[in-house]
UniProtKB/Swiss-Prot annotation:
Biological process annotations from GO: adenylate cyclase-modulating G protein-coupled receptor signaling pathway; gamma-aminobutyric acid signaling pathway
Name of the protein: Guanine nucleotide-binding protein alpha-7 subunit
Positions of the UniProt region annotated as Disordered: 1-42
UniProt keyword annotations, A-Z: GTP-binding, Magnesium, Metal-binding, Nucleotide-binding, Transducer
Organism the protein comes from: Dictyostelium discoideum (Social amoeba)
């Protein structure tokens, strides 16, 4: 286009109008009429606001991609028999491919081991409670004790399991099983296995998901489980919770995204296997306090699982929490009041100003853990985005 400040007679080149060339030249005055009118103040404000929104959306999308591309490290902590390993099993069921037939067959030995350990504990409990098991069960009791001592569970004779099934109907055995707790130690899942003992003794028995979830195998090392939830990658590290293994925890404190701390609600009337005298609930609260008050974790989210809700609800019908906490003055069999009291006791170990995300869980309930972990994912995603300024 010719400049409007000269008087040359050179023809004005054709200009593009919606992609078509105009064949006739235009005067300077007609050319300036094609410019857009100035933007009104209100329109300009809306434009700037939309531009800011678009910029924020772009930033959020970049941060979400960053989260998707990274791996969130979850450190799973808690004392022995809190249910930590059950949470790991649930991740395998929910977010990996579950258990193969070969893995289920391999898990069978742990089911048998649990049954023998439960039967052995109850037999010993009968002695503690001065309950007599009839002599007709002498042979099966001897077999149970021998297997327990040798730890040979792989090729367990099914007749032994059938013998346990018969023994479980005996009145002394039943009374001992119902009066464990502070009297002697018993697996928290004992009722599950005793109620279905006939199925476990079948020749073609293959463990179900529930059987595997209820099976207790004490962690003695560190295990890592990698999985994804809606595109977000997680690495869950389960560290053994017994006293002798806690010195290993510090080796996994670096680059932690969050800590999942698990406490069993039903351990208030039990003592540690390690020393036979320390109350397990008191020990769990102490260890929780040691972790949450560590300077390493001042900026790390702490997610608390108050686990074994189902067993807790059953236990307080017989034994109230005042056996551990004399300052509890509510009804001994009131689930809600007992739960609120325990929650306050546990959280009182937090001497920092940081929030603790608390969930009441049943780790053997796949639906419950699925919902809880979705909430955990949302918490961690939101926290990561807030750290990115979103």
């Amino acid at each position: 286009m010719s400049s409007t400040t000269t008087n040359t007679t050179t023809a004005t080149p054709a200009i593009q109008v919606n992609g078509n060339q105009s064949s006739s030249p235009q005067s300077p005055s007609s050319s300036t009429s094609t410019l857009s009118p100035p933007m009104s103040p209100s329109l300009l404000t809306r434009y700037r606001e939309q531009k800011a929104v678009n910029k924020q959306i772009e930033k959020q999308l970049k941060e979400e991609k960053k989260i998707m591309d990274s791996e969130l490290k979850l450190l799973l902590l808690g004392t022995g028999d809190s249910g930590k390993s059950t949470v790991v099993k649930q991740m395998k069921i929910l977010h990996l491919e579950g258990y193969s037939q070969e893995e289920r067959i391999n898990q069978r030995q742990f089911v048998y081991r649990n049954i023998i350990e439960i039967a052995y504990s109850i037999i010993r409990g009968c002695g503690v409670l001065n309950l007599t098991i009839p002599s007709q069960f002498d042979s099966i009791c001897s077999s149970i004790e021998e297997i327990y001592e040798t730890k040979n569970y792989t090729n367990l004779d099914k007749n032994v399991l059938k013998g346990v099934a018969e023994l479980s109907k005996n009145e002394s055995f039943i009374n001992a099983a119902n009066n464990s707790g502070s009297n002697f130690q018993l697996h928290s899942s004992s009722q599950y296995f005793l109620d279905d003992i006939a199925r476990f003794s079948e020749e073609d028995y293959i463990p179900t998901d529930q059987d595997i979830l209820y099976t207790r195998v004490a962690s003695t090392s560190v295990s890592e489980t990698r999985f994804s939830v809606r595109g977000i990658k997680f690495r869950m590290i389960d560290v053994a919770g017994q006293r002798g293994h806690r010195d290993k925890w510090i080796h996994h404190f670096s680059e932690v995204t969050a800590i999942l701390f698990v406490i069993s609600l039903c351990e208030y009337d039990q003592v540690l296997e390690e020393d036979g005298k320390t109350n397990r609930m008191i020990e769990s609260i102490k260890v929780f306090g040691d972790i949450i008050n560590q300077r390493w974790f001042k900026d790390i989210p702490i997610i608390l699982f108050l686990n074994k809700r189902d067993l807790f609800a059953e236990k307080i019908k017989k034994t109230g929490i005042s056996i551990c906490f004399p300052d509890y003055t509510g009804p001994s069999d009131d689930y809600e009041q007992s739960l609120v009291f325990l929650k306050k006791k546990i959280l009182s170990a937090n001497k920092t100003s940081k929030a603790v995300y608390t969930n009441v869980t049943t780790a053997t309930d796949t639906t419950n853990i699925g919902h809880v972990f979705e909430a955990v994912k949302d918490i961690l995603t939101r926290q990561t985005m807030e750290e990115g300024g979103i």
